[in-house]
């Protein structure tokens, strides 16, 4: 199994540091051999390909040493994995700025006339250009003094990112409420909350998704919602405010050293969008389009709030006409029930976890010609962790890869939903092969003593989305690890996973593939209820997308221009929430401090979610026309989009599949505008 999985989690805390030191020594030795090759003897194979082989070994061990920072139940393991991640990150930054290594690649290109008349494949030529680009992004063209300064800045940014994420994962905030204060929250949901033993009858609400979301959605007590939202918006505010604000300043400084106006200009230069001007015009265009619709939606929600207040005998003279941020989820849900008769508590009875996972797996298996089989989990980090093999049913059941799933919340675990590509997959021309391994971490509703884990429809959508990332990794058919799976431009990486969300809104899929009542799996979601769910899909959709644009604009604002131009991130966040989302967060909060994307790889790139939805909607139009379970289309999707990873520009990938350039029309159509 170890031969296939290529992971080896250390058995003790001491092993982490020992293995990380050995890893750096081995990598240095390998680089030395590449650097010492005489200039006249340099070839693609002994310089570029040799580096990829070295990188693969480094990355495999690095995953083994750092991943458990996100998942281990042992705080000591999480801490040492974070320490090792900081050490390896510092080492990687220094390596990516080595002049002698860069010179080896430059010499190789010169020796081979920039490979202009070579028989290198398109992917090999891309490997050359991306390797050189990586060094140039790290300032190898700068004088030594500036390079040293840049290295110092990049190392500090990396350290800050690790601390920022760790603070969010380690948050232990919980608030105690009586049953009266939790009025409206379903009984079985309250049963899943931790009991407050010091106050009999009280329950704790943590800031994890399965606690916060039902509270904001169902609790009739506005003061409870206000308190929970305030705590959530203040998560890590003390620890992460200085980290976030310092990082923004450091990024600006780094961008200036590299010859860019600001960090957003630097990042966008290497993405599909090409420039920060294009990001800002895209966001502004979408904002203008959505705002009038959102104003209408807010008016309806305000009227509903007042109507309910008066129906309960409230005094019109003392009515508070404000519509607060903690009102949103609650009145949206009331409207869903009143206007569409969609009760999410009833809906989730038809989504028991074991039915949903089987259904989602079946959809992916049927559509993409693959098969998943549970296998004994290799070095599992928790008893709930499961592992599956993935084989290609269209090609003699050949193994494609393995994936882990770890789906329920626990202390110290990564608190959102994400997929880690632990081991890159590739097959070289000489037959050398490595199978990909991915890990999917989520925080779905846990089972209670009386009911199994029942997923909300939103959680079903999240599962489908994240599993799209898993399949992007499993489907990889590239020659070089640099291009494996989700190693694509950041503003394309969400396209496949967002595409698969559409299956969660298909009537046949919902009824026949994903649902089965938890008391009797043969009882499917009633057809009329599904039709009402689909009809309500775009309920208050403009508000939802304005919120996405608000987050993208906040991300863009802190990375555009000089950070000295804004006083602090809390004020900036509040202003953008007021002006853009039309619904400000509570004063005294700063949700930017727990906005993991900002220091988790989406810096100046949060626009990517909405941007890539335009691509996924364009692809889904074809499935919608020819059938969502069309195997021929599924095979095309797997081979033309998922399998190619980053081995070609993503603009080429999307145009190859569509037969034309994507546009925003398909997306606007899906949201009913």
Swiss-Prot record:
Keyword Zinc: yes
This protein's UniProt keywords: Hydrolase, Metal-binding, Metalloprotease, Protease, Zinc
EC number: 3.4.24.-
Record note on cofactor: Binds 1 zinc ion per subunit.
Domain of life: Eukaryota
Disulfide bonds: none
Co-factor(s): Zn(2+)
Tagged with keyword Protease: yes
InterPro entries: MetalloPept_cat_dom_sf, Neurolysin/TOP_dom2, Neurolysin/TOP_N, Pept_M3A_M3B, Pept_M3A_M3B_dom
GO molecular function annotation: metal ion binding; metalloendopeptidase activity
Chain positions recorded as Zn(2+) binding sites: 465, 469, 472
Active-site residues, Swiss-Prot/TrEMBL: 466
Alphabetical list of SUPFAM superfamilies matching this protein: Metalloproteases ('zincins'), catalytic domain (SSF55486)
Gene3D superfamilies according to UniProt: Collagenase (Catalytic Domain) (3.40.390.10), Endopeptidase. Chain P, domain 1 (1.20.1050.40), Neurolysin, domain 3 (1.10.1370.10)
Single biological process term from Gene Ontology: peptide metabolic process
Family: Belongs to the peptidase M3 family.
Name of this protein: Thimet-like oligopeptidase
Organism: Dictyostelium discoideum
């Amino acid at each position: 199994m170890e031969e296939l999985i290529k992971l080896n989690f250390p058995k003790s805390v001491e092993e982490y540091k020992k293995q990380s030191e050995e890893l750096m020594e081995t990598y240095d030795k390998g680089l030395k051999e590449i650097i010492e090759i005489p200039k006249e003897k340099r070839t693609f194979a002994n310089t570029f390909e040799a580096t990829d082989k070295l990188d693969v070994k480094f990355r495999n061990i690095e995953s083994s040493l750092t991943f458990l920072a996100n998942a281990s139940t042992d705080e000591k393991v999480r801490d040492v994995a974070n320490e090792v991640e900081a050490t390896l990150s510092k080492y990687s930054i220094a390596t990516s700025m080595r002049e002698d290594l860069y010179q080896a690649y430059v010499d190789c290109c010169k020796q081979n006339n920039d490979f202009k008349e070579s028989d290198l494949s398109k992917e090999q030529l891309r490997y050359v250009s991306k390797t050189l680009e990586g060094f140039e992004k790290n300032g190898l063209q700068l004088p030594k003094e500036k390079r040293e300064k840049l290295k110092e800045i990049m190392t500090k940014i990396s350290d800050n990112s690790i601390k920022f994420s760790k603070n969010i994962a380690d948050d232990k905030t919980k608030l105690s409420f009586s049953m009266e204060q939790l009025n409206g929250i379903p009984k079985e949901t309250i049963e899943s909350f931790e009991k407050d033993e010091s106050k009999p009858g009280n329950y704790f609400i943590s800031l994890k998704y399965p606690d916060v979301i039902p509270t904001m959605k169902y609790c009739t007590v506005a003061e409870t919602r206000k308190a929970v939202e305030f705590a959530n918006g203040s998560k890590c505010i003390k620890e992460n405010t200085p980290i976030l604000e310092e990082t923004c300043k450091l990024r600006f400084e780094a961008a200036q050293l590299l010859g860019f106006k600001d960090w957003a200009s630097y990042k966008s230069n290497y993405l599909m969008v090409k420039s920060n001007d294009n990001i800002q015009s895209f966001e502004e265009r979408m904002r203008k389009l959505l705002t009038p619709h959102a104003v209408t939606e807010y008016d309806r929600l305000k009227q509903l709030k007042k109507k309910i207040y008066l129906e309960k005998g409230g005094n019109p003279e003392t009515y508070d006409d404000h519509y607060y941020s903690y009102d949103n989820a609650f009145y949206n849900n009331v409207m869903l029930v009143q206007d569409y008769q969609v009760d999410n508590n009833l809906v989730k009875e038809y989504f028991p976890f074991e039915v949903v996972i089987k259904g989602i797996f079946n959809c992916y298996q049927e559509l993409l010609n693959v098969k998943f089989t549970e296998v004994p989990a290799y070095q599992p980090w928790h008893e709930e962790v499961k592992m599956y093999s993935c084989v290609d049913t269209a090609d003699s059941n050949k193994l494609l890869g393995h994936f882990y799933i770890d789906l329920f919340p626990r202390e110290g675990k990564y608190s959102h939903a994400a997929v880690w590509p632990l081991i890159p997959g590739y097959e070289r021309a000489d037959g050398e092969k490595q199978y990909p391994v991915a890990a999917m971490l989520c925080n779905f509703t846990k089972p209670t003593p009386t009911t199994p884990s029942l997923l909300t429809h939103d959680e079903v959508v999240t599962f489908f989305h994240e599993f799209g990332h898993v399949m992007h990794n499993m489907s990889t058919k590239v020659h070089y690890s640099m291009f494996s799976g989700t190693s694509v431009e950041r503003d394309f990486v969400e396209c496949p996973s967002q595409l698969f969300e559409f299956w969660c809104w298909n009537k046949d899929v919902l009824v026949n593939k994903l649902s089965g009542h938890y008391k009797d799996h043969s009882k499917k979601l009633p057809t009329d209820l599904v039709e009402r769910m689909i009809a309500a899909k775009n309920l208050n959709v403009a508000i939802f997308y304005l919120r996405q644009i608000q987050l993208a604009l906040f991300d863009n604002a802190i990375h555009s221009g000089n950070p000295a131009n804004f006083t602090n991130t809390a004020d900036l966040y509040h202003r953008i929430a007021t002006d853009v989302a039309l619904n400000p967060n509570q004063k005294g909060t700063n949700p930017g401090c727990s906005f993991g994307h900002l220091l988790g790889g989406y810096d100046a790139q949060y626009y990517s979610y909405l941007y890539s939805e335009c691509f996924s909607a364009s692809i889904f139009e074809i499935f919608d026309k020819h059938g969502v379970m069309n195997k021929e289309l599924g095979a095309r999707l797997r081979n033309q989009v998922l399998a190619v990873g980053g081995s070609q520009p993503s603009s080429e990938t999307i145009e190859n599949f569509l037969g034309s350039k994507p546009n925003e029309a398909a997306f606007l159509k899906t949201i009913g505008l």
